[in-house]
Every structure is written in C-alpha cells, then in structure tokens.
Amino acid sequence: LETDLADGVNPAETEARTAERGLTYPFAGPPASGEAIRVAEDVLWMRVAMPMQLDHINVYAVRDGDGWAVVDCGLAIPGTKDEWELLLAGPMGGDPVTRVICTHMHPDHIGLAGWLCERFDAPLLMTRLEYVMARMLLADTGKTAPESGAAFYRAAGWDEEQIERYRKEFGRFGMAVAPLPASYQRIRDGERIVIGGRDWTVVVGEGHSPEHACLWRQDDGVVLGGDQILPRISSNVSVWPTEADADPLGDWLTSLERMKSVFPDDVLILPSHGEVFRGAQTRLEALIRGHHVALKRLARSLKEPKRAVDVFPALFARPVGDGVRGMATGEAIAHLNYMLLQGTAVRERDADGVDWWRSTTNGEEAA
C-alpha cells in the first residue's frame, strides 16, 4: 500500500502544484503500454499495468552488452506476460534479458522475476533479506493462518469477522508471484555492480521492506529508486504479525535521512510508481516532515486511549476499506510502536487481548 500519508499529497495533483513543491518532471508523461521512453543513456522506462488503485509499476531496462538488465517485473497475473512480450519484442528489440534485478520482494516487483530468469537463463540479483523473505512468504502459500496472526489483529481492534477474513486470505503471496529461482546473486549496500560497462552503486534503505536496494549510476546521476523515493505518494511502512514489536518507521526515517546525505538534489530519480523526476532532497525532506506531522496528529488523537483501528482518521486522508485494512493497520501500528519506543506513548492490553494506546505528550513532542 502506497498512501498519501507522508505529505498529504493527492496523487492526482497537477504538475504545477508538484513543481511548487520543488519537483520537476523532465518528460511529458509516462510511456504507453508496450512502449518505452529513453530516460538516460542506455536506460528505458516502461510500464506494466496492475488491477488496483495503484494501477501500474514502472519497470526499467538497462543496456547490458548485447542484451538488457531488467529492474523489477510486475505481478504474475493474467495479462502481464503479454505486456512483457510486447516490451521484449518492441522497445527492447528482441534482445535477451541478461539479468533480473529486483529492488525488493513485494509482489509487484518480483512477480514475474522467476519467469524472466527461466526464459532467458538469467540470474536473479537481490539483497539477501529481500530474497530470503520472499522465499519464506512463498513457502506460506496455501498454509493455514497462525493463531499469532489472529491475535495480532485482535490486539489492533479487529472484530471476529475481519479476523476470519484474514484467515481466509492468508498465504496468498504466491498467487501473484511466480516461483523464484532456487539460487540468486546477492547485492550489498555500497557494492558497485557493472551493467553495460558502467558502475551502479547499491544504496540500501529499510522500513518499507527489510533491505530495499536502490541503484545509482554516479557518472550521470541516474537513480533507480524503487519504492524508496516516490514523487507523489509515500511508501507503506508497516508492522506485520511476524514481528509485532518492530520499528519500521524508525528504520524508514533513518534511511530517508541517510539518502539525504547520499543523493544530490539534481539526480534523476526513476521511481517504481509515478513519473521520473528531479528534486531528491526536496522530496526526501517532505517524506520525513510528513511522518513527523502525522506523529503529532496521532499524539493529539491519543489524549484518550484508542486501539490501532481507531487512529486511522489521524493518519489517512481516505476511509480505510477491507481491501487495505491490513496495510492500514500495519502502518498505524508502525507509528504507534515508534511513539512507544520514543517514550511518547504507552500501551496497555485488556482482558480481551486488545491493545489500548495513550499519548504521554500534548502532541508537540511526539515527533
């Protein structure tokens, strides 16, 4: 779930409004289906559709000798392979895929990685935590939901009908992800990998996923940003039942601060969603500021004890429906856990196993 949480930005805002925020878009618009835009030397920007409100993922091809290194892949659902066939035969000129690089393990990024790797006998490149987490989630496909997961959502304030829906939907990760290769090539933070004779530096971020990789071609300032720096929306930062006391928001904010010290403002950001843009420093600052503003709103809403599901209005501009309830709950708990670890909130569990959260500040100190 990518949301408009972090800067209060409506994804449909005008280009002029966005320009006022310090971002510029060098291209007139995104590529059409089956087509590509050359955004930098030897780099193609393409799109694959997704059947949801966030209706696309950007995928990129970087010239690599006689073929292409592909960055991210789209969901393994009907129609996506057909889109890839058009891209492979069209803008990619029928040349082979030399390697598949996935920025992180979310299904829209790795869904067809296994298919592309198998078709072209190409290696898969990922960070270790992302690969291992993907393999773990794939292994859960079709399994029964653990009771610890039900308890997690009960503690957040879900009713029994909602918990039953969680049980029915558990283990669906593999429904949109083709089987991954049994081996992979690890990429590490700070490592330089050579694509087409040019160096790309791996820059890792945490919070949205465990070990998200950006790739930075420093000689001309091109950054394959994945979900780390999106132009108009903020990447989901969630706590999940597997690690209920995690602090992904702390990890996310630390990563954003680090990115500020790494990327110059004029780099060309190639994001996974939205349009290619410049203004990295401005956007990173807005993402950080937005979460701190949200934390202050959250603290003010917690003058009286509330459950995680009760704080949605303080965090989200839109109503939360069943389709995104899990991600919204995870993001709410991420903010609550952050406050708990900062000492600005307390948590008490009642006899029914429900957690009640209360602020220890007036809201101004929460962030």
Could you say what each language-model-derived stretch is?
Residues 33-95, 215-231:
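Conserved beta-strand hairpin/beta-sheet module of binuclear metal-dependent hydrolase folds
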